[in-house]
């Protein structure tokens, strides 16, 4: 695997010099300063690429070129935004970038309720508390139709949870959910959030799938022209939330995606932490089944909790993800590619990381503390080296 590191640009507290010292050889980044829907200019791409290469690193993956909400809904200026997206892909290809990660999640990217969940060893992790989320959706957001989606017991527990929240904790919960997490390019107030959700009225899973297919039918030819691979990121968490449909959550969704627009450049980002939240997602089988279409991987693990739907982010080699099996399957896939004289290395980044040691004293981006990710990268690298000796 190609060891990479997510970098949020020149203002990231983790510098390119730091990244070199982690052992990573590739960088995963984007031009976050460019508003959603606008074309990424060649000059800006070249400047960022030169900055990375000046530190003897490679810009391995763009994560991500955000898909404008109008494209997902097929409303407003969606056709203009699709044309801009295609031009951005061509500009990236012109600059020698070969892989783009993107997602098709409506309104929110990844969602958590707690950004400072304390683990038994004193480190901190990200957490999705289903009861807290229900309290937000039912009694703070007061989403229309939400009542029918929860049992009486779930509603009672959510009410108790909310009643025990201090005012500042309530504000924090709201901010955690709707204020935008790292990599997300949008944030909202409660009223704006309600309006955004209402815009998806009438768009169910089948309709969102249709919109994704139409989008891919337009951008895949541009990607093929530029020799650039498209790697869709799964939903996080991988199930419908807030009345919004989700279209990249399980194996059947991947099969649909690859069959809807067959192309050697239409592929996936294997995010083990996202897919792994669901017990019915067999990650090793997914690698074996879709290996040739895995263009990028995020390796992290989650631990499902007693309350259905709740989970927290575990250590990279802990939790519910069979990381040994997943890495072994990825190495087997790389060997197949190498045997067929195809580009073999799959870019991998240690996704998220616990806040540990002196990172606990820093105001790091949630999930993106330096030391926690470096620990995860070292663990996965050691696992990879050990497994290679057995293949």
UniProtKB/Swiss-Prot annotation:
Catalysed reactions listed for this entry: D-mannonate = 2-dehydro-3-deoxy-D-gluconate + H2O
Domain of life: Bacteria
One example GO MF annotation: mannonate dehydratase activity
Co-factor(s): Fe(2+); Mn(2+)
Top EC group: lyase
Function per UniProt: Catalyzes the dehydration of D-mannonate.
Protein name: Mannonate dehydratase
Organism of derivation: Marinomonas sp. (strain MWYL1)
Gene field: uxuA
């Amino acid at each position: 695997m190609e060891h990479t590191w997510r970098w949020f640009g020149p203002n990231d507290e983790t510098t390119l010099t730091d990244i070199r010292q982690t052992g990573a050889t590739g960088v995963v980044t984007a031009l976050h300063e460019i508003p959603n829907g606008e074309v990424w200019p060649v000059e800006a791409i070249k400047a960022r690429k030169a900055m990375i290469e000046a530190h003897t690193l490679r810009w391995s993956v763009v994560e991500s070129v955000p898909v404008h909400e109008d494209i997902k809904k097929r409303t407003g200026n969606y056709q203009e935004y699709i044309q801009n997206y295609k031009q951005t892909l061509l500009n990236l290809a012109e600059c020698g970038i070969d892989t783009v990660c993107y997602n098709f999640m409506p309104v929110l990217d990844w969602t958590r309720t707690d950004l400072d969940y304390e683990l038994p060893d004193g480190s901190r992790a990200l957490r999705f508390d289903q009861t807290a989320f229900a309290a937000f959706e039912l009694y703070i957001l007061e989403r229309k139709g939400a009542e029918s989606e929860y049992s009486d017991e779930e509603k009672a527990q959510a009410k108790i949870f909310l009643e025990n929240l201090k005012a500042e904790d309530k504000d924090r919960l709201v901010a955690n959910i709707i204020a935008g997490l790292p990599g997300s390019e949008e944030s909202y107030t409660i009223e704006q959030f309600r309006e955004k959700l209402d815009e998806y009225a009438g768009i169910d899973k089948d309709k969102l799938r249709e919109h994704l297919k139409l989008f891919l039918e337009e951008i895949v030819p541009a990607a093929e022209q530029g020799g650039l691979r498209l790697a869709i990121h799964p939903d996080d968490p991988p199930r419908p939330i807030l009345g919004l449909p989700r279209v990249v959550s399980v194996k059947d969704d991947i099969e649909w995606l690859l069959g809807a627009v067959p192309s050697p450049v239409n592929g996936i980002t294997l995010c083990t932490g996202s897919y792994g939240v669901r017990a019915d997602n067999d990650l090793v089988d997914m690698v074996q089944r879709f290996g040739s279409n895995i263009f990028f991987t995020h390796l992290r693990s989650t631990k499902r909790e007693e309350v259905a739907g709740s989970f927290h982010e575990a250590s990279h080699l802990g939790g519910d993800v069979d990381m040994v099996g997943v890495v072994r399957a990825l190495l087997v896939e790389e060997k197949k590619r190498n045997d067929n004289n195809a580009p073999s290395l799959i870019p991998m980044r240690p996704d998220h990381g616990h806040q540990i040691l002196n990172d606990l004293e820093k105001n790091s981006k949630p999930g993106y503390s330096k030391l926690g990710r470096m620990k995860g990268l070292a663990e996965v690298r050691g696992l990879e080296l050990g497994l290679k000796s057995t293949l």
